[in-house]
Amino acid sequence: MKRVAFVAILGLALVSSKAKAEDSSPAQVQKGAELFALNCATCHGTRMRNPQWAIDLRTFPKDAKPRFIDSVMNGKRNMPPWDDVLKNEEVEALWAYVSSGDRD
């Protein structure tokens, strides 16, 4: 039973990850940019450019939304978890920004 539930949840995550940045509202992308500047730019670089030692998020796969959310919420390698700082809708806004590639 647990395996069926896991597969169902994974399937939903994969389907939702297919949403493109264009599906995000401009307001959500803007909110994500603001959150990024406040919380992420120190390590990932201003506007995702020239990260000092963290991953260059401009190269993050656009079809890896579940991986992005898991990394932000639970941390990964040198990145701390942000689950006690960011709300789910804020992580969604960050994804909208990151997956948009900051074209400005």
PLM feature spans:
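Bacterial N-terminal signal peptides that target proteins for export
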Residues: 1-6
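Bacterial N-terminal signal peptides
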Residues: 7-13
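Sec/Tat signal peptide C-region and signal peptidase I cleavage site
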Residues: 17-21
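Axial heme c-ligation environment in periplasmic c-type cytochrome domains
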Residues: 51-60, 73-104
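Gly/Gly-Pro-rich "capping" loops immediately C-terminal to redox-active cysteine motifs
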Residues: 26-33, 45-76
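Short cysteine clusters
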Residues: 40-43
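Short sequence/structural segments immediately N-terminal
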Residues: 29-30, 35-36, 86, 103-104
